[in-house]
Curated annotation (Swiss-Prot):
Its EC number is 2.5.1.75. Substrate binds at T13, A14, S15, G16, K17, S18. Residues 36-39, 160-164 are annotated as: Interaction with substrate tRNA. The lineage of its organism: Bacteria, Pseudomonadati, Pseudomonadota, Alphaproteobacteria, Rickettsiales. Catalyzes the transfer of a dimethylallyl group onto the adenine at position 37 in tRNAs that read codons beginning with uridine, leading to the formation of N6-(dimethylallyl)adenosine (i(6)A). Belongs to the IPP transferase family. Monomer. This is tRNA dimethylallyltransferase. Keywords: ATP-binding, Magnesium, Nucleotide-binding, Transferase, tRNA processing. Pfam families: IPPT (PF01715). Its cofactor is Mg(2+).
Length: 315
């Protein structure tokens, strides 16, 4: 039996995935499913550069900006939701087009994942209360006694990973890293994945990264993060999107606005570089689209339906 098709449009931040994916979905009767770990959160659409409402009014978008930032989210939870949406889209006769740059999600979807048990809400609250009382250093010391492997791999300044490892060892009695040795579970084995990798020339990409982040800062990101800071304790939130840390520092008068923007731009460029390296080495079978300027990118947009052998409505 011929496998059903899924398109994954991936690449570094600011590479044009949203624009290109939207054009592709319109041309090929597709629906878009998020595969970015930060764009799931509903309180931070601006800083995460989530698709605009104008896009969402034209075609269906799934798994964007739906989850409260107070809710814990994992790759396993993502995969279950993504599989559900993919099956719904294909059942309706549409083409699922997954867009994003989170390597862990893409790798787990395509090649399988390590199923780490969910943490009970009671235990989660207990660990967060404990961390609030004793801090990172002491929690890291306690993790060393329970799980020396995890403590050796996790820096005590990495609050999220530290708490996660401590929760897992308390819940399961096993190191979080022990689950990586188990056979991987496949969630969508009946599908064929066609992976498209956007690979802009480095200098051009860095220019776009800088410009986009400057616009994001101007277009409401500061107010967005200020509201979160007012309502929640950022230490316990999964706020890893580039720019959030710098805006928080600005709001706490630790950086000027210019310093915050410059630092965030530097981090964005480094993040983009890491993403490119990851995709080049981890995803072997893919269609790579190279471009070095805006005209090249527009040409890629026009030709994409033909390149991946899908019907084109000539839009």
């Amino acid at each position: 039996m011929q496998k059903k098709e899924i398109i994954i449009l991936c690449g570094p931040t600011a590479s044009g995935k949203s624009y290109l994916g939207h054009a592709l979905a319109k041309a090929c009767d597709g629906e878009i499913i998020n595969i970015d770990s930060m764009q799931v959160y509903k309180e931070i659409p601006i800083i995460t550069a989530s698709p605009p409402e104008s896009y969402k009014s034209e075609i269906p978008y799934h798994l964007y900006n739906f989850l409260p930032i107070t809710e814990d989210f994992s790759v396993v939870k993502y995969l279950k939701l993504a599989a559900e949406k993919i099956n719904q889209v294909t059942a309706s006769g549409k083409l699922p087009i997954l867009i994003g740059g989170t390597g862990l999600y893409i790798n787990s979807l395509v090649f399988g994942y390590n199923n780490i048990p969910d943490i009970s809400e009671d235990l989660r609250q207990q660990v967060r209360k404990l961390h609030n009382e004793i801090g990172n250093t002491e929690l890291h010391n306690r993790l060393t006694k329970l799980d020396p492997l995890a403590s050796s791999k996790i820096n005590q300044s990495d609050t999220q990973r530290l708490i996660r490892a401590y929760e897992v060892v308390l819940q399961t009695g096993k190191s979080i890293f022990s689950f990586q040795t188990l056979p991987k579970e496949q969630i969508l084995s009946e599908f064929n994945f066609k992976i498209i990798f956007l690979n802009p020339e480095r200098k051009f990409l860095y220019k776009i990264c800088d410009e986009r982040l400057a616009n994001i800062f101007k277009d409401g990101a500061i107010d967005e993060i200020a509201l979160i800071k007012k309502q929640f304790n950022p230490d316990y939130l999964n706020l890893k999107a580039v720019g959030i840390k710098e805006i928080l520092a600005y709001l706490e008068n630790k950086l000027t606005l210019s310093e915050a923007l410059n630092l965030a731009q530097t981090r964005t460029r480094r993040y983009a570089k890491r993403q490119i390296t990851w995709f080049k080495h981890q995803i072997k079978e893919k269609i790579t689209l190279d471009y070095s300027n805006e005209e090249d990118f527009l040409q890629v947009t026009r030709k994409l339906s033909i390149l991946i052998d899908l019907p084109n409505s000539n839009k």
